[in-house]
Design a protein with these regions (language model features):
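Transmembrane alpha-helical segments of polytopic membrane transport and secretion proteins
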Residues: 1-40, 289-330, 407-414, 578-590
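Short glycine/proline-centered loop/turn elements that form peptide/ligand docking sites
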Residues: 194-198, 482-486
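Glycine-rich helix-loop "coupling/hinge" segments at transmembrane-helix boundaries
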Residues: 70, 241-266, 350-353, 528-558
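Short, membrane-interfacial amphipathic segments enriched in basic
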Residues: 17-18, 22-26, 67-78, 83-84, ...
Length: 590
């Protein structure tokens, strides 16, 4: 398989019969480089993901009186499955997870379809700006969104009279806020490439606009809608920070229950069972998402010969188009813009409504119960996110480079598919499980006398684990679109494997790599689940500080949390606006 990945140069340019030895040396070098490209990410994932997660889960399944490390302990007690699954609370949490994810998915699709039509099928001045506004919520840190909607629904907020604070409705609305752009971008990008002639033919035959939509347009959009719905369900089912802030003790998901069981009750058996249960749910959802995505790709391939996309202006929308425009305007202004605007306004006012900058001045004061200020936490967040982004881009870039190869053998193709799937696992495992697994595993690992939990690299490594799948999905489509004959031609002309990568692959992935850096940085900046376990008191990140502030009573603490959330939102949005400028035509969509 390795010789297929990097064809060795023939060496026919070498004089005096040295071609074979030179070609053999270059072939050996190529194989060594490809082995390293697989081994380095594999070792990273094994040490910093598979080992901690397996240790965490196995520790929960060890017998209660077992004192040895669970990986090597013969004392097993799988009765924890029956005990935990027999608790009414467990099934209540599972039911709430599916209920919240189901409601969030349905509402996101229903509201996102009109937005996809307006923003991708129609054209108007400022459309690119509106698209950017729609995209920003998806990359905002979860604690920022949680604080923003909490400030809307709490008693002193604009919607406090509705009694929705810490309710199921508040959670679902926040989930739609996050995932609206997933539907708009996934369905809209597909819709923009649909051939308009079938719709025109149906209208010419007398079909009403509603019937055209029902019998022609929606069936054609079905693969994209299914793909978007599966992704939204996945994001809703694994939501953590937003649900933890808005749900309180009444509402939660499997993800938040793992956190509660681990931090408040030290019930590792329950946390382990719930982690396995979440893995099963996520695996099923990702399988459905993969099938739907494959259908969407095949449908796009069939559209390849269709005429170029034809966007219509907003004039002459008709009743259906006008309704889509109205729904989109209400969603963008009311659901996306208003919560963040309210967050900014509330951060500039006192509890009695007076305008002030005191909340921002408080960012320079130590947070209650800590010697760290919010500004210091912001600096820590920027530094750790930068390190995490570098790690994620290096590891994720190597994975994408290897997976993009096209081996001739079926075994080679299956091996690369397996490698791709393994590096997607961090998407399906609770960040809480990863974080606590770090604490358990790195406490003098393998009998070493060094406690690695005090290392300053622990937080960025955990954040990088979460960001690697995003880097892979951003860069991989570009590498797969590269014609392999270009690499083969360069190798035939005598270029070594490293030079082939530098002169053929790298120039094409520079812009997508910039986008991947932005995504990795933004994800790491707002990561909360694993960081909540690993951040030391003197090096807390800004999301951790915000969560601590809203957990303390007093209007001053909440006002400081609002100001800190605004700072975090502005930094994240700025990073993503810059990163989006690096997007190429074939860069992956998240």
């Amino acid at each position: 398989m390795t010789t297929t990945l990097a064809p060795a140069p023939t060496g026919n340019r070498a004089p005096h019969g040295d071609a074979a030895p030179g070609g053999a040396r270059r072939g050996a070098t190529g194989r060594a480089l490809w082995f390293a490209a697989v081994a380095v990410p594999g070792l990273f994932l094994a040490v910093f993901f598979l080992w901690p997660v397996a240790t965490m889960i196995l520790k929960g399944f060890a017998a209660p009186d077992a004192t040895a490390h669970p990986v090597w302990s013969p004392a097993w007690d799988l009765g924890g499955f029956g005990e935990v699954l027999g608790r009414p609370r467990t099934w209540r949490v599972v039911g709430l997870t599916f209920l919240q994810a189901g409601l969030g998915t349905v509402l996101s699709v229903l509201l996102g379809l009109p937005g996809a039509y307006v923003l991708y099928r129609r054209t108007f001045p400022g459309r690119a700006f509106v698209r950017a506004v729609v995209t920003v919520p998806f990359v905002l840190p979860t604690v920022v969104v949680g604080v923003a909607f909490r400030s809307l629904f709490m008693d002193a907020g604009p919607l406090g009279g509705l009694g929705l604070d810490q309710s199921l409705t508040a959670i679902v609305v926040a989930l739609v806020f996050f995932n609206y752009s997933v539907v708009v971008r996934t369905v809209g990008g597909f819709w923009a490439q649909l051939d308009a002639r079938p719709e025109q033919a149906a209208r010419a035959l007398g079909a009403s606009p509603l019937r055209v939509l029902r019998t022609v347009t929606l069936p054609a959009l079905a693969p994209a809608i299914a793909s978007a719905a599966a992704l939204v369900f996945f994001f809703c089912a694994t939501a953590f920070g937003t649900v933890l802030i808005l749900g309180g003790s009444r509402f939660g998901t499997i993800e938040t229950e793992i956190y509660v069981r681990t931090t408040q009750f030290l019930d590792l058996r329950a946390a382990a069972v719930l982690s396995v249960l979440q893995l099963v749910v996520v695996a099923a959802v990702l399988w459905v998402s993969g099938r739907a995505s494959a259908r969407r790709v095949r449908a796009l391939a069939l559209l390849g010969a269709a005429p170029g996309e034809r966007r219509l202006r907003l004039r002459g929308l008709g009743a259906g188009g006008a309704a889509s425009l109205a729904v989109t305007a209400v969603v963008v202004l009311g659901l996306l813009v208003w919560p963040m605007t309210n967050l900014l306004v509330r951060s500039l006012r006192t509890a009695d409504g007076a305008w002030t900058l005191q909340n921002y001045r408080n960012l320079a004061e130590p947070v209650a119960g800590s010697s760290v200020t919010a500004w210091q936490a912001a600096g820590t967040s920027l530094r750790t996110a930068a390190v995490a982004a570098v790690i994620a881009v290096i590891v994720g870039g190597l994975v994408a480079l290897v997976v993009s190869r096209r081996p001739r053998s079926r075994a080679g193709r299956r091996g690369l598919a397996l490698l791709d799937g393994v590096f997607m696992l961090p998407l399906g495992v609770s960040a809480v499980t990863v974080g606590f697994g770090f604490l358990v595993t790195l406490d003098r690992p393998l009998g070493l006398g060094v406690d690695l939990r005090a290392s300053g690299l622990l937080v960025p490594v955990a954040q990088a684990v979460v960001a690697i799948p995003i880097v892979v999905r951003t860069v991989l489509p570009v590498l797969r679109a590269l014609d392999p004959r270009l690499r083969e031609a360069a190798a035939t002309l005598g270029a070594r494997p490293g030079r082939v990568l530098a002169t053929v692959d790298l120039p094409l992935v520079t812009r997508p790599l910039g986008l991947a850096v932005g995504f990795a940085f933004a994800v790491s900046l707002g990561e909360f689940g694993a960081t909540a376990f690993l951040a030391r008191p003197d090096s807390a990140t800004l999301p951790v500080v915000i969560f601590r502030l809203i957990g303390r009573p007093g209007a001053e603490n909440f006002g400081t949390a609002l100001a800190a959330a605004v700072v975090l939102a502005v930094v994240t949005a700025t990073v993503m606006v810059v990163a989006e400028q690096m997007r190429g035509d074939k860069a992956g969509e998240l």
